[in-house]
Amino acid sequence: MATPSNEWVNLNAPQKLDPFKGVKKLPLEEYFTSGHRTCQGCESALVMRMMVKAAGPRTIVLGSTGCMYVANTTYYSTSWVVPWMHTQLGSSGSAGLGAAAGLKALMRKGKLKQEPINVIAFCGDGGGADMGLSAISATLTHPDYNVLILMYDNESYANTDIQLSGSTPYGAHTTFSPPGKARRIMHRRWKKNMAAMLAAGHPTCRYVGTVCMSYSVQAMNSVRKALSIG
């Protein structure tokens, strides 16, 4: 049993996750395994696999409603090896903050060993750039809790038949912006610049980055860098 402590507990600061030097240096252990029901060739499943492989086994993942909720939580089964929790569509940030605060409280009371445990909250652009933006913004104003928020940018509400989102680029054809006879370009709003907006508006946020899974090692190293910074 761990002993209670009145000291401030920083969950992630003590760990140092070195960057991977290449594909051949990646660990063999998998924490997001086969058996999920994503579509063939789905990149979101690859993102989940690489994200949690980079983070390691001492990780809690929280995911908002979307494809990665529907496809990975078949009744009585899951592809997640690490603890995973579903959150409502707009609450990934607040759920991640609550998980980090709960871990910190349990460690302070001596009910958990004081060690770095990664808390990663995952959402799509609908749950991040639109409905979940306020929760993410509120989470980033609490620098004493360490939460990594990862937004997968589909540039649409992809789980519900490609509707328009705040991350949809100008001129895109979606089910909410089909081309018409009078106006061929129906979507005339510009895509939100989420990275710049979060970085500029939250000076206590310690890390903001953008990645592309075509460069998977670089993406995994960005996850490790964020978790090391805390």
How would you name each of these model-derived features?
Residues 1-117:
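Thiamine diphosphate
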Residues 116-119, 130-148, 152-230:
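Glycine-rich ThDP/TPP pyrophosphate-binding loop and its adjacent helix/strand module
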Residues 124-127:
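Active-site metal-binding loops of divalent metal-dependent hydrolases
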